[in-house]
Amino acid sequence: MDRLKYDIVVLGAGESGVGAALLAQAKGLHVFVSDYGKIAPKYKEELNRYAIPYEEGRHTEAIILEAKEIIKSPGIPDTAPVIRQAVAKEIGIVSEIEFAGRYTDAFMVCITGSNGKTTTTMWLYHTLCKAGLDVGLAGNVGFSLARQVAYDPHPYYVIELSSFQLDNMYDFRANVAILLNITPDHLDRYDHRFELYAEAKMRITRNQQPEDCFIYWEDDPFISRWVAEHPPVARLLPFAMEARTDNTTAWINEKNELVVMNLNSPFVMDEELLALSGMHNRHNAMATAIAAKAMDIKNEAIREALQDFKNVPHRLEKIARVKGVDYINDSKATNVNSTWYALESMKTRVILILGGTDKGNDYTDIENLVLSKVDGLIFLGIDNEKLHKFFDGKISRIADACSMHEAVSLAYKMASKGDTVLLSPACASFDLFQNYEDRGDQFRKEVLNL
């Protein structure tokens, strides 16, 4: 650390940060990586291999605050002291996606939304691959965009974007932008103000041109109002559960067919043939089909991809049937709206495992579904007081668990033949688990050990 002035300082040494460091070095920039926590061995080994200087367990301000530009990993809040100091010194702060976008002319398909973005990203990636395109998968899934731009470039990218990534994007342009929905989530990062969170999501349309496309859920009142008040310059391609206007591009007709119009040849497909069930997956399928049609993918390839796609892990993932009881892993449901969609898709009585780190949740949204479908609740978390306050007296069987082993054991005892045990926590996982993947993996392990 003898050189104190770097062109780029990367904060955070996960996939996003290390990818950004690799690209910065490949472009001849002097780069330094700083992580306040511990760097995973595989990333430390990579930084050593490329001789990129780094630190862990601290943020050395003397180095960071002398940088020409900072690339901030999405997990670091703007309230972090080092970020506040950098802003005060007027040091530019960008996301890894923004940085990577400077070094590629690839066609960018970007997906955001409070729920469904991983499924839609993977479904669209699957569709484009099936159509024969050379496409990279980036953002919150796959390898970082920066890493791919540096060492494995593609002419097309499908990118899942969180609101945190969109916050630090300024010049990046999405050729196709998809906004699936906006519901309260991560409000702790937005001063508990929904409008600030929603504005971050709408940044996906920033820098779009008339030849670009903006695909959005027309049934969402906030999105529709925003589009009316701030008309994007891109071509508008909305989808809805039924045709609302002449401009509606995709909907479900009276024959229960998914219809896409206004894009070259019409596309019609029986919704029963879709690989994934549930109302939310009809939305995801419509967005996928519109994007593929907008990119001139043939109907055959779209139809095939919509039929044979396999769902992503931790999203309504069926683990096993044990003594006539289905066990479903929906650990990726980290907000109430995701849990609403999971419950809506259930066809049996449910034992529901809820809880974790609350992000300002309002459980009123799932109350009716819980009352009509749930026979037992298991609260999995260190602090379940808010859940008890809301649900006590409404469901007769409620239990607390402080480990996944205990939660699955309780669910096993509560469930009857024909029921479904559903892990759909509606909360973040950081009180008891490393992340939602760890939570889902532990659920899978415990179920398979029954």
Curated annotation (Swiss-Prot):
It is an enzyme of class 6 (ligase). Gene3D superfamilies: Mur ligase, C-terminal domain, Mur-like, catalytic domain, NAD(P)-binding Rossmann-like Domain. One of its GO terms (biological process) is peptidoglycan biosynthetic process. Pfam families: Mur_ligase_C, Mur_ligase_M, MurD-like_N, MurD_N. It catalyses: UDP-N-acetyl-alpha-D-muramoyl-L-alanine + D-glutamate + ATP = UDP-N-acetyl-alpha-D-muramoyl-L-alanyl-D-glutamate + ADP + phosphate + H(+). Its EC number is 6.3.2.9. Signal peptide: none annotated. Keywords: ATP-binding, Cell cycle, Cell division, Cell shape, Cell wall biogenesis/degradation, Cytoplasm, Ligase, Nucleotide-binding, Peptidoglycan synthesis. It is found in: Cytoplasm. InterPro entries: Mur-like_cat_sf (IPR036565), Mur_ligase_C (IPR004101), Mur_ligase_C_dom_sf (IPR036615), Mur_ligase_cen (IPR013221), MurD (IPR005762). Belongs to the MurCDEF family. PANTHER family: UDP-N-ACETYLMURAMOYLALANINE--D-GLUTAMATE LIGASE. This is UDP-N-acetylmuramoylalanine--D-glutamate ligase. It comes from Porphyromonas gingivalis (strain ATCC 33277 / DSM 20709 / CIP 103683 / JCM 12257 / NCTC 11834 / 2561). The gene is murD.
